[in-house]
Amino acid sequence: MVIRSEIVSIGDELLKGQRVNTNASFIASALSDIGIPVVRVVACGDAEEEIMSALRESLERADIVLVTGGLGPTRDDRTLKAAAGLLQRDLKLSPAAFDALQEWFVSRGRKMPEAMRDQARIIEGSLLVPNTTGTAAGMIADAGERFMNHTLVLMPGVPSEMKAMMNQTVIPYFATSSKMVIRHTPVRTLGIGETLLAELVVEVEDHMPEGTTLAYLPHTAGVDLMVSTIGSSVEAVERDNRGVVDALLARTGRYVYATEDVTIEETVGRLLAQRGMTIAVAESCTGGLLASRLTDIAGSSRYFLEGVVVYSNKAKEHFLGVKFETLQLYGAVSPEVAAEMAEGCLFVSGADIAVSTTGIAGPSNESEDKPVGMLCLGVARKEPGGEVSVSTRTLFYHGTREQNKLRFSQAALCEVWESLQDR
């Protein structure tokens, strides 16, 4: 039987949009890795009655309820009192938690305020979850027959404290009780939208084995597919997961750059290093973002030679040798200029491959035939015979300036990746 869990995130700041709920994301991922799916995430305010209501509903539905927030020493921290009231149990001082709390203050050369004693209180009969990075004790409690002996976990809302508790105590505790095996495999794509991707893989989705799900994870730079398989047998889970991934690759292979958690810049870097090739970039509309992404990868000095940002027409002429006539005739945002930028970059740098970007990121400077979101890419590379080949591509995007710049850089990396496929 699959163990089902829910997350309850407590804090008015979450409901007001003053904080992003990163805790829930971390907990869900950690539980998924040990075969415990999260079926619901609930957020509620700091009022005691709201907390009790949220905990009651979650404990009635889920085998495990994990709670973050509301365990601190201030007046708006009401989670512990609400949970104890719901379970109809007293709060007891934990000697181990109290000793750790005193040590926390001593190690910082401070005297512990008497009011901080409450940070060492836990629900009667619960298991202490030590806080090795803060003051508030966590706990794992059996909710009793009233809630079908479901389990309640209380942790602070401070991300660093919650993560330490999860890694050191909570995950090891539940890993022994979960008999399920889970396997996640990302299928990372580029150059294709979510709708078209869904059309390509609809047959795969319709015939997936029991226990396997497919999630679409669109983001600014592309669309990822996540194949998740859960079951009781390691061999069966691996077989079913691999089978679905292979079926997806058979239909989307030309758009897939990885089936592991790596970025396109990492993939391009690996290909360049494997082939003993070097790269240089000439950027206008991306303003150095492309070079930044390539050099974010450790070891990129093996293949990245240089990058130049040529924003003005004069800079394009001066640094890359783009012809004045080409700029006048076609304009800076054109396939012709992109080609000359890439070829000039290849010549100046001595790299094996060079990529150029010129476009209109927005929100202004568009014209009737050159709208915001227009991108012209150029790729120049040295061929085995010594000659130079140059290719261009024109693409159109819709988004904010920041989104367009990211998509432009992603498209440039995609172009390089495609260019390396036949090497």
Curated annotation (Swiss-Prot):
Protein name: CinA-like protein
Coiled coil spans: none
Family: Belongs to the CinA family.
Matches recorded under InterPro entries: CinA, CinA-like_C, CinA_C, CinA_KH, Competence-induced_CinA, MoaB/Mog-like_dom_sf, MoaB/Mog_dom
Database matches in Gene3D superfamilies: CinA-like (3.90.950.20), MoaB/Mog-like domain (3.40.980.10)
